[in-house]
C-alpha cells in the first residue's frame, strides 16, 4: 500500500476495474433478488449534494444486500420531460444574465460550452453525460445497461401503453379542476417547473358574500363557521380595488375586490369583467349585511390587509381571532372621521360562537390579556393566533348561536357549511396557494380552473382503497411516515395529467396534450427490465405494441400471439416476461421526503392500478434534505455544491462517508467544510491502521490463545457487526457508520493501548468489509492489499457470532477503563504527581448485596425497604446493618437508571475484581507512571485514610500518595 492515502488515485483505479469486470450488471439467477430504485434525477442542471444523499443511501443499501448474497439490481435513468428544460433552453438562447452566471459559476459549465446549450435536446445530452460521469465518480454500483431518458421514443411507447390502460379502467377523466398554472406558458405547472414555492399547495377557501346595496364584498376564509361571529370587515385604505361583473351558473353579481384578486378571478370558472375602479375610502365606514346572520357589520381601515391574499378584504371575528381583537382594540382611540366613522368602536360587542375546553367565552381576548400582548404588531400575536386556532379546531364545538349547526365539532363543519352557503348563494369556493408560486420562466403562477383538462382520478374511492391495502402490506422506513402516507392518500384529489407545452409523450387518445412530468414517472421501474433488452438490440420501436407490454408486464395474452404480431421470437418474449417475473416487485423505493405527497404517492397509485397484487411495491424509504452551510440549495438560483465538485475536492469515499454520517433518515443534513475536513482525517486514520496491520505481516486466527483484552475485542466486534446490520436493514446510515467506524475505531485504539495485537488482522478483515458499502474504493484497495483476488464488493458481509460475545470480558475491561479514568480524574483535580496508587476492591458483603438485588428485581421493581429487609434477613450480612441502608439507597437509583445490566453481569459471572486489577496492574502503572498496589476492602494491608470503606463492586476505592 502507498504510504499516504491518495483518494483520487485509488478511486480512479477501482472505478476502472468495476467498469471492466461488469460486477454490478445483474441478470436473473438462482439467488434471492433485491430490486432497489431511487428517483431518476431531473436533468436541468448538474447533480448536487442533495442528490448525493439520496443516491448514496440507495447505493449503500445495494452494496450491503449484494454482500449479504442477494442478486441486486440497482439501475438508473434520466428524467427530462416537462417544461423546465424547455424554459432553460430559452433562457440560455436569450443569454439571460442570471442564468448564464448560475450555470457557468455554480454548475461549472465551461464558458465556451454553455452558450451552445440553446435547445432542449442539447441540454439533455450534456447533462445526461455529466450525471452519469458524476455517479461513476462517486462509485455507485449501478447497472448502466438499463439507462434511458424519458424522451426516448421507446420510453414514449411504454408511457402511451400505460395511459391507454389507465383510461380504459376509467381512471383518467376529463373536466374542470383547480391546477397550478403559468399564464405565460399557458400550461399547468408541477414541482419541477417551479422557481419559488415548490412546496405550495392549493387550498380551498370559502368566499363569504357580504352585501352592500347591489354590491358584494367577498371575504375568503378557511373557517366559514366563524362568519357567525363577524363584527366588522377590514379594508386596506392603500389598496386599489375594482368593481367587477361576476357571472357563474347564470347568476350575475357585482363584486368589489382588489386588483390582484380580480386577476385571480379571471382564471376561475366564472365569467369576470372589469367595470370600474373603486376608491378604498368609498368602501370604508359602510354598513354591510352578514349573509348568514343578517346582522349589520361595519367596514374598518386596516393596513395589514394584503391585496394579494384572498379578495383583498378580510372579515373580522375578534372573539376568536387574536389579530382581529388586537386590531379592533388598536382603533378604539383612533380618529376615523376621514372615513365618516363617528361610532365609538368600544360599542362593538364580541360574538362568541365556539365552546373550547381551555377557554371561556372570548378566547382571543383571554389569550391576548394572559400573554400580555400590547398590539397587533407584537411578536406574540402570531403565537397566540396559532394556539387559539389549534385548540378550537381540535377541541371546539359550535354554540347555540349557530342554529342548526350547534354541537358540530369545528374540525367537521367546513364542508357541511360551505355546501349550505353555496346552495343559498351566501358563499362560493375559491382556490388560493398556500404560499406564492413563481414559474421557472419568472411568471407568478395562479390557480386556474381549467376546462376540458385531463385528470388522473385519484379521488376514486376504489382506487384509494387499493393503495391503502398496498400500504398496509408494505414496510415504511421510518415507520412513523406511514401515517404521513395514509393522510396524503386520504387528502389526494384528482390531478391534471396533461399539458400543452414542454417535452414528453403525447396523450395517446388526445394528441393535443402532453403527459405531464410526474405522470410519466410512476411505473418506470418496470421499464428498467425492458431497457436491458433494448440495450442488447433485441427490440425495435415498432415491436413495442400494446400486446407486447400487456404480456411482458401484466401476463395478459400469450407469447405466441405477441410473437406473431411483433415478429419477435417467442423465446425472447418469454425471456423478457421471465426477467420481469424475477425482478418484480420493487423491493425498495428510496427517496427524499419532498416526494412523499407527489411522486411516491403516484408511484403507489399507478402500481396498484395496473399490476396484480403480488407485483405491488414491498417497501418505501424516506430521507431528509441537504443544505449548504445552512442555506437551502437550488439548481436554478444557488447556492449549490455539485456532486462532481465535491468528489473532485474531497474524494468519493470521504464525500460518501460525510453525507451519510451527518444526519439520520428524515433529519436534514447540513454540508459544512469543517465536517468534511473531519471526515477526511477519520478516513486517513483508517487507512493508516490498515497499512500498519498489513505491513506487520501478522495473521493470527481465533485459534490463537486469547487474553482478556482479546476476548473483549472479539466481543465488541460482534456487537458492532450486529448493530451495523440492524441499522442498515432500517436504512439508518448514521447509526451504521457510528457502529462500524466511530465506536469501533475507539475500541481498536483501546485494544492497542492495552497491548492487544493478536487480533488486529481479524479486526481489519471484518472492519474493512463492514465499511465497504460506505467507502467502497478504499475498502477494495485494502482488501486487495490483504491478498484477496476477488473484489470486496462481492465478499461476504460480516455476520455476528453470538458464541464470541463475552459479557464477562466486556465488564472486566469496562472496570479497568473506569478505574483508570477515576485515577486520572483525581490526579487532574488535585494536581498532584502520584508516587504510588492503592486500589481497594469491594468487600464480599457488598458483592452479595448486589447479587440479592439482582434476584429481587426479577420479581418486582426494586424498593429500598424491601431490599434492606432481604439483606438484613441474611445472617452473614446482618452484622453490616449500619452500612446496608446507605449502600442500598445508593445502588437502587443506579439500578433504575440503566446500571442493572452491569450489576447482573457482575453478579452472575462472579467477576473477581481483585484478580482482574492485579492482572492489569502493569498496564495501570505504565499509564499512571507509578507503582499500583491492589487490596481487598475485606483485608487491606495498608489503608492510612480508611479509603477502603468506599469501595463498591465495579468501583474500587482509590488512595494516592
Curated annotation (Swiss-Prot):
A GO CC annotation recorded here is: cytoplasm
Sorted alphabetically, the Gene Ontology BP terms of this entry are: leucyl-tRNA aminoacylation
Query: Coordinates of motif 'HIGH' region in the sequence?
Result: 41-51
Q: Which UniProt keywords apply?
A: Aminoacyl-tRNA synthetase, ATP-binding, Cytoplasm, Ligase, Nucleotide-binding, Protein biosynthesis
State which Enzyme Commission number(s) the record gives: 6.1.1.4
Catalytic activities: tRNA(Leu) + L-leucine + ATP = L-leucyl-tRNA(Leu) + AMP + diphosphate
Q: Where is this motif: 'KMSKS' region?
A: 632-636
Q: What class of enzyme is it?
A: ligase
**Pfam (any one):** Anticodon_1
Chain positions recorded as ATP binding sites: 635
UniProt-annotated location(s): Cytoplasm
Matching entries from InterPro entries are given as: aa-tRNA-synth_I_CS (IPR001412), aa-tRNA-synth_Ia (IPR002300), Leu-tRNA-lgase_arc (IPR020791), Leu-tRNA-synth_Ia_arc/euk (IPR004493), M/V/L/I-tRNA-synth_anticd-bd (IPR013155), Rossmann-like_a/b/a_fold (IPR014729), tRNAsynth_Ia_anticodon-bd (IPR009080), Val/Leu/Ile-tRNA-synth_edit (IPR009008)
**One Gene Ontology term of the molecular function aspect:** ATP binding
Name the family.
Belongs to the class-I aminoacyl-tRNA synthetase family.
Specify the protein name.
Leucine--tRNA ligase
Q: Which organism is it from?
A: Methanosarcina acetivorans (strain ATCC 35395 / DSM 2834 / JCM 12185 / C2A)
Amino acid at each position: 500500500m502507498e504510504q499516504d492515502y491518495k483518494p483520487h488515485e485509488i478511486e480512479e483505479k477501482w472505478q476502472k476495474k468495476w467498469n471492466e469486470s461488469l460486477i454490478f450488471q445483474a441478470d436473473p439467477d438462482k439467488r434471492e433478488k433485491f430490486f432497489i430504485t431511487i428517483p431518476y434525477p431531473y436533468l436541468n442542471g448538474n447533480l448536487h449534494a442533495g442528490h448525493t444523499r439520496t443516491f448514496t443511501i440507495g447505493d449503500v443499501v445495494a452494496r450491503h444486500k449484494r454482500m449479504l448474497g442477494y442478486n441486486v439490481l440497482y439501475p438508473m435513468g434520466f428524467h427530462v420531460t416537462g417544461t423546465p428544460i424547455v424554459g432553460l433552453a430559452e433562457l440560455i438562447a436569450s443569454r439571460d444574465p442570471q442564468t448564464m452566471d448560475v450555470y457557468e459559476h455554480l454548475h461549472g459549465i465551461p464558458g465556451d460550452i454553455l452558450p451552445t446549450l440553446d435547445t432542449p435536446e442539447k441540454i439533455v445530452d450534456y447533462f445526461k453525460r455529466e450525471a452519469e460521469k458524476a455517479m461513476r465518480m462517486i462509485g455507485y454500483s449501478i447497472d448502466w445497461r438499463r439507462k434511458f431518458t424519458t424522451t426516448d421514443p421507446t420510453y414514449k411507447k411504454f408511457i402511451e401503453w400505460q395511459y391507454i390502460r389507465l383510461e380504459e379502467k376509467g381512471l383518467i377523466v376529463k373536466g374542470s379542476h383547480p391546477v397550478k398554472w403559468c399564464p405565460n406558458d399557458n400550461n399547468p405547472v408541477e414541482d419541477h417547473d417551479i422557481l419559488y414555492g415548490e412546496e405550495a399547495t392549493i387550498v380551498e377557501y370559502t368566499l363569504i358574500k357580504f352585501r352592500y346595496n347591489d354590491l358584494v364584498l367577498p371575504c375568503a376564509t378557511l373557517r366559514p363557521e366563524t362568519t357567525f361571529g363577524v363584527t366588522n370587515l377590514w379594508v386596506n385604505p392603500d389598496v386599489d380595488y375594482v368593481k367587477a361583473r361576476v357571472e357563474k351558473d347564470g347568476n350575475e353579481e357585482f363584486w368589489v375586490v382588489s386588483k390582484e384578486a380580480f386577476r385571480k378571478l379571471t382564471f376561475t370558472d366564472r365569467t369576470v369583467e372589469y367595470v370600474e375602479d373603486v376608491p378604498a375610502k368609498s368602501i370604508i365606514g359602510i354598513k354591510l349585511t352578514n349573509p348568514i346572520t343578517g346582522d349589520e357589520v361595519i367596514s374598518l381601515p386596516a393596513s395589514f390587509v394584503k391585496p394579494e391574499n384572498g379578495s383583498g378584504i378580510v372579515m373580522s371575528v375578534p372573539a376568536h381571532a387574536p389579530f382581529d381583537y388586537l386590531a379592533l382594540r388598536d382603533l378604539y382611540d383612533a380618529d376615523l372621521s376621514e372615513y365618516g366613522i363617528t361610532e365609538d368602536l368600544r360599542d362593538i360587542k364580541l360574538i362568541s360562537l365556539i365552546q373550547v375546553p381551555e377557554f371561556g367565552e372570548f378566547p382571543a381576548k383571554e389569550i391576548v390579556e394572559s400573554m400580555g400582548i400590547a398590539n397587533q404588531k407584537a411578536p406574540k400575536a402570531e403565537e397566540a393566533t396559532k394556539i387559539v386556532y389549534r385548540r378550537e379546531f381540535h377541541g371546539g364545538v359550535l354554540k347555540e348561536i349557530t342554529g342548526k349547526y350547534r354541537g358540530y365539532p369545528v374540525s367537521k363543519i367546513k364542508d357541511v357549511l360551505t355546501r349550505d352557503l353555496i346552495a343559498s348563494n351566501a358563499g362560493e369556493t375559491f382556490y388560493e396557494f398556500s404560499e406564492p408560486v413563481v414559474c421557472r420562466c419568472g411568471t407568478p403562477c395562479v390557480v386556474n380552473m381549467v376546462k376540458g383538462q385531463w385528470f388522473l382520478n385519484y379521488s376514486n374511492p376504489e382506487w384509494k382503497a387499493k393503495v391503502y391495502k398496498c400500504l398496509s402490506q408494505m414496510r415504511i422506513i421510518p415507520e412513523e411516515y406511514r401515517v404521513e402516507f395514509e393522510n396524503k392518500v386520504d387528502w389526494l384529489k384528482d390531478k391534471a395529467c396533461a399539458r400543452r407545452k414542454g417535452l414528453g409523450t403525447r396523450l395517446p387518445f388526445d394528441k393535443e396534450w402532453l403527459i405531464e412530468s410526474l405522470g410519466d414517472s410512476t411505473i418506470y421501474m418496470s421499464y428498467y427490465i425492458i431497457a436491458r433488452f433494448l440495450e442488447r438490440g433485441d427490440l425495435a420501436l415498432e415491436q413495442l405494441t400494446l400486446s407486447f407490454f400487456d404480456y411482458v408486464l401484466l401476463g395478459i395474452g400469450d407469447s405466441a400471439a405477441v410473437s406473431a404480431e411483433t415478429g419477435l421470437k417467442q423465446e425472447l418474449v418469454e425471456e423478457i416476461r421471465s426477467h420481469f417475473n424475477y425482478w418484480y416487485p420493487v423491493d425498495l423505493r428510496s427517496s427524499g421526503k419532498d416526494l412523499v405527497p407527489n411522486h411516491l404517492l403516484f408511484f403507489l397509485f399507478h402500481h396498484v392500478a395496473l399490476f396484480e397484487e403480488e407485483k405491488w411495491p414491498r417497501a418505501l424509504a424516506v430521507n431528509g434534505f441537504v443544505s449548504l452551510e445552512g442555506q437551502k440549495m437550488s439548481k436554478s438560483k444557488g447556492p449549490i455544491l455539485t456532486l462532481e465538485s465535491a468528489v473532485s475536492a474531497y474524494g468519493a469515499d470521504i464525500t460518501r462517508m460525510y453525507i451519510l454520517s451527518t444526519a439520520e433518515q428524515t433529519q436534514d443534513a447540513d454540508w459544512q467544510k469543517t465536517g468534511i475536513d473531519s471526515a477526511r482525517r477519520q478516513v486517513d486514520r483508517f487507512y493508516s491502521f490498515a497499512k500498519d496491520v498489513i505491513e506487520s505481516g501478522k495473521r493470527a486466527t481465533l485459534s490463537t490463545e486469547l487474553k482478556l483484552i482479546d476476548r473483549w475485542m472479539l466481543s465488541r466486534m460482534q456487537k458492532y457487526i450486529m448493530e451495523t446490520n440492524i441499522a442498515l436493514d432500517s436504512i439508518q446510515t448514521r447509526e451504521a457508520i457510528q457502529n462500524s467506524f466511530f465506536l469501533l475505531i475507539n475500541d481498536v485504539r483501546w485494544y492497542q493501548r492495552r497491548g492487544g495485537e493478536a487480533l488486529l488482522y481479524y479486526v481489519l478483515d471484518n472492519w474493512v468489509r463492514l465499511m465497504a458499502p460506505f467507502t467502497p474504493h478504499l475498502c477494495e484497495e485494502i482488501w486487495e492489499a490483504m491478498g484477496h483476488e476477488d473484489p470486496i464488493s462481492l465478499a461476504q458481509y460480516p455476520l455476528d457470532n453470538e458464541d464470541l460475545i463475552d459479557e464477562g470480558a466486556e465488564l472486566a475491561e469496562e472496570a479497568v477503563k473506569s478505574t483508570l479514568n477515576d485515577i486520572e480524574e483525581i490526579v487532574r483535580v488535585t494536581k498532584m504527581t502520584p508516587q504510588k496508587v492503592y486500589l481497594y476492591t469491594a468487600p464480599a458483603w457488598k458483592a452479595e448485596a448486589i447479587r440479592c438485588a439482582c434476584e429481587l428485581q426479577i420479581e418486582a421493581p426494586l424498593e429500598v425497604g424491601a431490599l434492606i429487609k432481604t439483606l438484613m434477613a441474611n445472617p452473614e450480612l446482618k452484622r453490616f446493618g449500619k452500612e446496608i441502608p446507605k449502600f442500598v439507597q445508593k445502588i437502587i437509583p443506579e439500578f433504575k437508571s440503566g446500571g442493572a445490566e452491569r450489576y447482573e453481569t457482575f453478579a452472575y459471572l462472579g467477576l473477581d475484581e481483585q484478580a482482574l486489577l492485579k492482572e492489569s496492574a502493569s498496564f495501570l502503572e505504565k499509564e499512571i507512571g507509578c507503582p499500583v498496589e491492589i487490596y481487598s476492602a475485606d483485608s487491606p494491608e495498608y489503608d492510612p485514610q480508611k479509603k477502603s470503606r468506599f469501595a463498591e463492586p465495579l468501583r474500587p476505592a482509590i488512595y494516592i500518595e
